Each structure stands twice: as structure tokens, then as C-alpha cells.
């Protein structure tokens, strides 16, 4: 297990309860120091959390759109999984203009996103009613390819720091799968990476050395898995329904977790900086 010293893994409240709806999701750290996340005050909004933990509305999405996962495009814009409109939206970080970057009528409801260092990215796509799911590849020109069908409820998704592996969890089935990624973004060699006996899974993020942090929805914890799928830490939160996680702060070692039962975020320190934060330092 990771060393549990007094400075690590102790959750604290970032903002007051219920500033966000129960649909709070998609936290994503930006190189400008802000964290962007969905459903501030009302459904269909995106909120912004400043480095000093002030939170405000960033933008209202178009009518009929509600965001879920957010990731940062290599050019700095926000990429938002619009699960109601079956779209991937691209929002200019400077002028706030919104465009549909990708759309496919075969998408159930795009849920979470994960970028590859080469510039393409993936979307999880669950069908909650049928307890099934898909994985989509989205290229830099917005073209979409369904890579996997008939999985369980695909939810959390992440690419390893070296770009060699894709991790996808199935919330209802409580399984995390690992795939190999080729240079074109195709995936193969589906392998069971980790399985939990109870409760659900939601968003996932890697730190810079490849540890995978997984939110345990309903259990109120975040687990940390090493690159072999072994649990090396479990962090107990104050809330019970963590939906997603990102890493930020001055050194990238502050984990921010969205809590749907509290409508807010909790944070705790980790031993290694997040991979997205680390990537921004190289740009």
C-alpha cells in the first residue's frame, strides 16, 4: 500500500454543499489553473473553480444539451460529453463559442472522455436501461468510430501516461478493463484489470507514474490501483457518491473529487502529480 502519512489522502471540503446539482461531474484541470465542471446551480451549465476555490458559472450550454465528462483539447479548449444531445461539444476557452465537434446517432449518451498523447480521444457510452455500453474513438477531425459494442455500462475511461493502454470501467458490472492501443488508436487484447465486489465505479484518472484513481460511487471512496491492477490505497471521503476526479493545484498533487450527494467537491493530496497536469507543464 502507498504510505499513508499525515499529509496524504485526507479529504477536505473545497466549496459549500449544493452549489452544484446532483449531476455534478466532469472536473477537468486546465493549464490556466482553473477546474471546469458541469451543472453549476442548474443542469446544462458549466462552472469554473478558480485556484483560490472561488466558483462561478462559466457558460450555459445550448438548450437540449447537458454535459457530463470534460477533458481539455490540446489547443486548450474544453471538450464536453453532451449526453442528452449525443454530441461531443468543443468550447473555445477564450470567447466561449460552442460548436458540435463530433456527433453520431448510434451513440447512446457519451459519458466520459480520455485523450491520447497523439491527439485522438475516446468516449465511454453507456446504455443504462440495457446495462450495456460502447467505446468510441474520435479523431482530430471529429470522425467517430465505434471500437467496442455489447460491453457492460461503460463509464470511467482513461489512457495510460505512456499512451499504450486504455482503461474503461463498467459501473454496474464493477469491472475495469485494459486494452492495448495501436498508433491509429485502435484497441485490442481486452484484459480484466481489476474487479470490485460491491458498489459502483465512475470517473477515473491516472497520475504521472501510471497509478489509476477510481471513484467508487455509493461507497464514498476513491481507490488507487498500480499499473498491475493492485489496489495500493483507498481514500475515504465525506460524501458517498463520488462521480469523477481530476488533479490540480500548484504541484498537480491535489485530487479534486465531485460528490453528487453533496453537490460540491472534496480534495485530498496524493504522492504524485496527475498526468494531465504534468502534460501541461511540457507545453
Regions found by a protein language model. Give the residues of each.
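Glycine/small-residue-rich hydrophobic helix-like segments
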Residues: 181-244
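A short helix->beta-strand "capping" segment at the edge of beta-propeller domains
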Residues: 1-21, 53, 59, 190-191, ...
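Beta-rich, blade/repeat-based domains predominating
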Residues: 18-32, 62-82, 87, 104-134, ...
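Blade-level signature of beta-propeller repeat domains, shared across WD40, Kelch, NHL, RCC1
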Residues: 243-283
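Short loop/turn segments immediately following the C-termini of beta-strands
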Residues: 40-41, 83, 126-128, 171, ...
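Blade/loop signatures of beta-propeller domains
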Residues: 1-10, 40, 125, 134
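Short loop/turn segments that connect beta-strands within beta-propeller blades
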Residues: 49-54, 92-96, 138-142, 180-185, ...
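A short loop-to-beta-strand structural motif that recurs across blades of beta-propeller domains
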Residues: 45-47, 87-89, 134-136, 175-177, ...
